[in-house]
UniProtKB/Swiss-Prot annotation:
Quaternary structure and interacting proteins, as annotated: Homodimer.
GO cellular component: cytosol
Keyword Metal-binding: no
GO MF term (any one): methenyltetrahydrofolate cyclohydrolase activity
Disulfide cross-links: none
Keywords: Amino-acid biosynthesis, Histidine biosynthesis, Hydrolase, Methionine biosynthesis, Multifunctional enzyme, NADP, One-carbon metabolism, Oxidoreductase, Purine biosynthesis
Binding, NADP(+): G166, R167, S168, S191, I232
Lineage, uppermost ranks: Bacteria, Pseudomonadati, Pseudomonadota, Alphaproteobacteria, Rhodobacterales
One record GO biological process: methionine biosynthetic process
Purpose: Catalyzes the oxidation of 5,10-methylenetetrahydrofolate to 5,10-methenyltetrahydrofolate and then the hydrolysis of 5,10-methenyltetrahydrofolate to 10-formyltetrahydrofolate.
EC number from the UniProt entry: 1.5.1.5, 3.5.4.9
UniProt-recorded name of the protein: Bifunctional protein FolD
Domain of life: Bacteria
């Protein structure tokens, strides 16, 4: 068996196209332009590239992009004052604070200063709690992207056994909550789970988000299972730096029914879902129906 390759890059392009259509409808029908504000503190090169990509794609779908690039020495009071202004700015429907923040800033304090309705990363404690209790919330972008791809590939997920390897607040825990919301039977595993391979082999859906390069090999995979690889790891191989996931693609693809590659799998969905969340936040703020299929 050779697994179907789930093309996250193509799927993300489809999500962005759908968002662009809905943005155009908002402009034509209601005179509303969704706005996304991104806040970057410091000069971290990877964060600068990521913020630039977010701004570019925001504009491409017809939204307003507001970038706030602050020096690394910005005080907590200054950052919180900016967030307060953005919270009260009617042109801004989504706010994202690029992480990680410099060490002198309290990330939890900053994230929880956001208006939960504008927290398009879904990290505010209110959104975390609402997701956990099955209420309408802003859903973290990476798990939302995984769910979209699973729905597209498998259709109804009800009754399937799902194993999420990883328990982070950003991916593992919200992914498990989303799968519970789809009526899956969910197991959260991690690096200390006893006989992890046996646990994973019981999964119809296997989500790897443990942060260990190529940890999940083919003998962890149930024949025909759908494998979603959230990991992004840089390793040295043959004198070159290579990007790999948490799944050993070559061996897992021989067993799985479908699998996401790294790169080109889950990664492109993160920004696409950020745009989808901004659209959702805009619709909610204006009392308009939310577009179907772009949120949980």
């Amino acid at each position: 068996m050779t697994a179907k390759r789930i093309d996250g890059k193509a799927f993300a392009a489809g999500v962005r196209a759908r968002v662009a259509e809905e943005v155009a409808r908002l402009k034509e029908g209601h005179g509303i332009v969704p706005g996304l504000a991104v806040v970057l503190v410091g000069e971290d090169p990877a964060s600068q590239v990521y913020v630039g990509a977010k701004g570019k794609q925001t504009v491409e779908v017809g939204m307003a992009s507001f970038e706030h690039r602050l020096p690394a020495g910005t005080s907590e009071a200054e950052l919180l004052a900016l967030i307060d202004r953005l919270n009260h700015d009617p042109a801004v429907h989504g706010i994202l604070v690029q992480l990680p923040l410099p060490a002198h800033l309290n990330a939890d304090l900053v994230i929880n200063a956001l208006d939960p309705a504008k927290d398009v990363d879904g990290f505010h404690i209110s959104n975390v709690g609402r997701l956990g209790t099955g209420q309408k919330s802003m859903v973290p972008c990476t798990p939302l992207g995984c769910l979209m791809m699973l729905r597209d590939h498998l259709g109804a997920l009800s009754g399937l056994n799902a194993v999420v390897v990883g328990r982070s607040n950003i991916v593992g825990k919200p992914m498990a909550q989303l799968l519970l919301g789809e009526s899956c039977t969910v197991t959260i595993a991690h690096s200390r789970t006893r006989d992890l391979a046996a646990v994973c082999r019981g999964a119809d859906i296997l989500v790897a988000a443990v942060g260990r390069p190529e940890m999940i090999t083919g003998d962890f995979v149930k024949p025909g299972a759908t494998v979603i690889d959230v990991g992004i790891n840089r390793i040295e191989r043959d004198g070159k730096t290579k990007l790999v996931g948490d799944v050993d693609y070559a061996s897992a693809a021989e067993v799985a029914g479908a699998i996401t590659p790294v790169p080109g799998g889950v990664g492109p969905m993160t920004i696409a879902c950020l745009l989808a969340n901004t659209l959702t936040a805009c619709c909610r703020a204006n009392g308009l129906p939310e577009p179907q299929g772009l949120t949980a």
